[in-house]
């Protein structure tokens, strides 16, 4: 039976990309349907308020860009705060600034000038004897030396990938962000911040006037959903979209443990702390 097209666009997934497409297309007069298999909008940037705190339910997401048009676009929707990502790593009770910069090198070796830091890194490179790195571990040591690798890279990387660093390919860490200035800003982009009121508020604004169906799995009735829209914009797992005929992609996930603590003021003194196996 012929089913009349009801929508110009079916958008599968209500994360940042799907929502942005829905917003822009709706602005141009197209009729869109957004579906999401989760019980909420926003995808992995979903936030909810807990005791006045905007909690990022799927891990922290800091918006950053050097494109002025993009920055003006998101700020036309909601106001962004001036959050600057400056994480610290806690290794055996000692704190190190990230990304690797002169503060890190001072904390690690006591050096105070870029020249001293470069000499220390070069010394450890030579001592490693690694000329042609065959895996991630060798690549990292050849780039930054053994001290920083074993203190700040190895454990967290192995947890992140679920494999030994010696089993991971070298290209994963071809470039390491290394700065020879006292700059703890994690990103090089010109603009960064987090939406005031959380990402969910921004997503809600973009979806205003757009039909949204939650708890709706595209693959639960794919033939039907494909039939009701002229075009489909899919933002989910790409291997599943092609029925795995090109193989299966390996996905890593994150386990979240939430603990509500009663405290006054700052608990850690920074928003983002890394431990050998955890982030807080």
Model-assigned labels for residue ranges:
Residues 28, 219-280:
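Mid-domain catalytic core of redox enzymes
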Residues 72-76, 148, 268:
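Structural/interface elements that position substrates and couple domains in central-metabolism enzymes
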Residues 7-34:
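N-terminal Rossmann-like FAD-binding beta1-loop-alpha1 element of flavoenzymes
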Residues 92-96, 103-231, 235, 240-242:
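Active-site/ligand-binding neighborhood in enzyme catalytic cores
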Residues 51-127:
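Dinucleotide-binding Rossmann-like beta1-alpha1 core, especially the glycine-rich loop
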Residues 26-51:
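Glycine-rich FAD pyrophosphate-binding loop
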Residues 12-14, 35-37, 65-66, 197, ...:
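Short His-Asn-centered micro-motif
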Residues 1-4:
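Short, Lys/Arg-enriched N-terminal segments with co-localized hydrophobic residues
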């Amino acid at each position: 039976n012929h089913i009349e097209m009801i929508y110009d666009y079916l958008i599968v997934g209500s994360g940042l990309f799907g929502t942005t497409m829905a917003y822009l297309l709706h602005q141009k007069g197209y009729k869109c349907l957004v579906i999401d298999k989760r019980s909420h909008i926003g995808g992995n940037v979903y936030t909810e308020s807990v005791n006045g705190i905007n909690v990022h339910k799927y891990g922290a997401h800091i918006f950053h860009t050097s494109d002025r048009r993009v920055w003006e676009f998101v700020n036309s929707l909601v106001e962004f705060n001036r959050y600057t990502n400056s994480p610290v790593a806690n290794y055996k009770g000692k704190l190190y600034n990230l990304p690797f910069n002169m503060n890190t090198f001072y904390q690690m070796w006591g050096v105070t000038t870029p020249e001293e830091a470069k000499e220390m890194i070069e010394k450890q490179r030579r001592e490693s004897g690694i000329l042609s790195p065959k895996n991630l571990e060798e690549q990292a040591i050849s780039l930054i030396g053994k001290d920083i690798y074993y203190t700040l890279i190895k454990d967290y990387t192995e947890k992140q990938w679920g494999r030994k660093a010696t089993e991971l390919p070298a290209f994963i860490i071809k470039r390491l962000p290394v700065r020879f200035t006292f700059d703890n800003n994690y990103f090089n982009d010109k603009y960064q911040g987090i939406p005031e009121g959380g990402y969910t508020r921004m997503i809600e604004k973009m979806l205003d006037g757009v039909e949204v169906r939650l708890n709706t799995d595209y693959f639960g009735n794919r033939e039907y959903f494909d039939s009701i829209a002229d075009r489909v914009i899919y933002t989910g797992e790409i291997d599943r979209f092609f029925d795995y005929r090109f193989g299966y992609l390996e996905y890593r996930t994150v386990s979240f443990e939430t603990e509500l603590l009663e405290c006054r003021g700052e608990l850690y003194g920074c928003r983002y702390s890394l431990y050998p196996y955890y982030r807080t």
